[in-house]
A protein has these predicted regions:
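Active-site- and interface-proximal helix/loop "cap" or "latch" segments in soluble metabolic
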Residues: 54, 59-111
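Structured beta-strand/loop patches that form or line metal/cofactor-binding pockets in enzymes
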Residues: 15-52, 57
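C-terminal binding/interaction regions
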Residues: 2-23, 87-122
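Sequence-level detector for tyrosine residue identity
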Residues: 27, 31, 59-60, 104, ...
Length: 122
């Protein structure tokens, strides 16, 4: 049962990372940032479309591990139509629970990298 549960969680992370619907930058917005995890070398670039103080769209490109890719994908979907001042609530939501699980504690910096890049872009 433990092995099965572990595989399911890993499959969830794989599924998140493989969703690349918001992958690819447009280079049309002033809300842009790149960020690097100095511990592991993961890199991300993010671009935000913001209108009326709401994030309408997030685009990203990564050179990173699966945890950072999954986090970027998940964040890019959940940030849409979020007021800029409410972005902090997304990363602590239940949606990120699978990525912030204590058994992946050593990957927390990887998971947080897209969020940090978004904050930097603002």
């Amino acid at each position: 049962n433990f092995i099965m549960r572990k595989k399911i969680i890993n499959q969830k992370i794989l599924n998140l990372a493989s969703d690349t619907s918001n992958f690819g930058l447009k280079y049309k917005s002033k809300y842009f940032a790149s960020h690097k995890n100095k511990k592991c070398g993961d890199k991300i670039k993010v671009e935000l479309e913001i209108k009326n103080n709401k994030v309408k769209k997030m685009y990203y490109e990564t050179e990173s591990c699966i945890f950072c890719q999954a986090s970027a994908s998940l964040l890019s979907k959940n940030i849409q139509n979020t007021f800029v001042e409410n972005i902090d609530k997304i990363i602590t939501s239940k949606r990120f629970k699978v990525l912030l699980d204590k058994k992946y504690l050593s990957r927390k910096d990887c998971v947080m990298l897209p969020y940090q890049a978004v904050k930097k872009a603002l």
